Amino acid sequence: LNQSPLAALRALPAQRSADVEAGLSWSIAGSISNHFTVQESDSGSLFLDGQSDVLSVAFRYGFLENWDVEVTVPWRHHSGGFTDKLITDWHKLFSLPNADRDLYPVDDLHYRLSLPGHQKKFDEPAFGIGDVQISMNRRLLVIDGGQLSVGAGAKTPTGKAADWLGSGATDYYALMRFTGQQLNGWPVYWHGQLGTTFAGRSELLGETQKRTLWFAGLAAEWMFSPRWSALFQYDAHSALLSADLAALSRPTGMLSMA
């Protein structure tokens, strides 16, 4: 899931199984995301340098055999962090591009979006509850070990927009999910989702923000023991803005492993 300070303002739901389990269940997911993006154009600039820590607690309740309702409460923390040197050393070890990180302070926090008539910046550490998401899902089909479900949800403006913990607007989304086991009987499960977000107007993103977005995801989960699995996941979504900044005006994809 894209945890960029600007992408995280939109309702881009995390991938999950299409399966529906009866009764109450809950889960905890955490991430540490290092951000470094520097872009300039004739009409604007973007500078993202910092770290976002996210801890999300999801409560799910399954009922009527094929339905469940889910509430996800995220806690977010923006700071200079501690991962800059680790990432720089990793890039040097494998001779990867480092985007001129060496020219900027280590473990610094500075987010800035500059567009015509729109200036937003953030440079003080902050933490708190982000935008809470509420969704309802219905399993439609179960065929040969595969399941298909549909869902709809909303992201509520519970996060403080001044601290970049939320968008300050309500977003709605609808999506379809699929889950199925590898046909040869291996303990590998595939998960996929495709959906659309109808976003409210956020003061943080300005007049060029896009209000209708698409998102998609595909994941392979290897269950190598009853309690443990390895996950390889790809997430993508459409551009956030129509501004002349490639990082925000083009579709984005992200590969992750866990």
Question: In which residue ranges do the predicted regions lie?
Answer:
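Transmembrane beta-barrel domains of Gram-negative outer membranes and organellar outer membranes
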Residues: 1-200, 205-258
